[in-house]
Each structure stands twice: as structure tokens, then as C-alpha cells.
Amino acid sequence: QKYRPKDGETGLPVLKIKELRQGICDASSELCSPSIKSEYIIHDGDIIFSWSGSLLVDIWCGGTCGLNQHLFKVTSNNYDKWFYYLWTAHQLDRFIAVAADKATTMGHIKREELEKAEVIIPSKCDYKRIRTLIKPLFDLIISNRIENRKLTALRNILLPKIMSGEIDVSDIDL
């Protein structure tokens, strides 16, 4: 890890392909300094594209973390996250095929291949109409994933305490 936490700093977990696949950072995740550039800090709802090894794209909802060099944070100043997430996901099979054709040991996609990807931009009127349908669903996916992460953490804290008898639930009516 290039940007390790300095003495006294509470490190940020590093988002690598393993964490992207499992949807969370865990105790085995490497740590980086929280003083890294803001563009390398990942937040819930960010779109992450893995370009090396395992090519995949996902909506990160695993909490704040630092970005590994084998991942891109996909952003746009002009379009909503749902738009560029869906287009990246649409292109993924082509990216995987290109990477497989060029793989010597580990497949990866080069920036020039990403730049060749074609995207159909709807008219402003159509974009707004599509946005009213898709954005609420996209926001709900993010919200549900975050809630799922929080509920999983709560379960992982409470279940051992209930199983050991530290917390008594025998009087709870269900």
C-alpha cells in the first residue's frame, strides 16, 4: 500500500477487487491514509469500475474507503450516476472480450479501449423523461444496499450476544 496511515491516523480501508466483489471492506482490508486526495476517496453510491484482472462495474455501498490503483471511480459532470453506470454495465461484455484477447497473464482494459466505447445520448427531453423513471429506482437500490449493510453489522453484533444468553429475548412477543 503506497499511502499507509501515518502514526496516530485512523486509516481508511482500501477498496480492492476483493472488497468490490463482496460489497464491503472487512478486517482483512488494507488501510490507507485518510489524507489521500479527495478524488481517491470512495463514498456510498459511487460507481466503481475494475479494469484489471476481474473486469466488473458496481455501485459501491460498502462505506467510505480509499481507491486502489486497479479501480476507477466513474464520474461525470454532465450526467447522472444511473446513466453512466448503465452504459458502463452495457459495455462490460465487450470490455471483457477485448481484455481476454490481449491477456498474457491477467486481462485488463486500456484507457484507449474505454475511449472507443460508444454511448447514445438521448435528447434533453427524453433524458428527463427517462430520468424520472430510473433515478428513483437507482436511488432505492443504493438506499437498500446501505440499509442491508447496516442491518448485517447489527445482526453480527447482536446474534452472538443472543446466542450466548448475554441478551435475553425470551419475553419478546413476535
Task: Provide a role label for each language-model segment.
Residues 26-27, 61, 131:
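Short conserved micro-motifs at the rims of enzyme active sites and ligand-binding pockets
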Residues 16-17, 35-93, 99-104, 110-111:
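A short beta-sheet element
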Residues 2-4, 16-18, 73, 110-111, ...:
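Basic side chains
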Residues 1-5, 11-44, 66-67:
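Sequence-specific dsDNA recognition surfaces
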Residues 79, 86, 90-94, 100-103, ...:
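Amphipathic alpha-helical coiled-coil/heptad-repeat segments
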Residues 32-35, 74, 138-142:
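Short, contiguous acidic/charged loop-to-helix segments that flank catalytic cores in large enzymes
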Residues 8-11, 23-25, 50, 117-118, ...:
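Enrichment for repetitive, rod-forming helical segments
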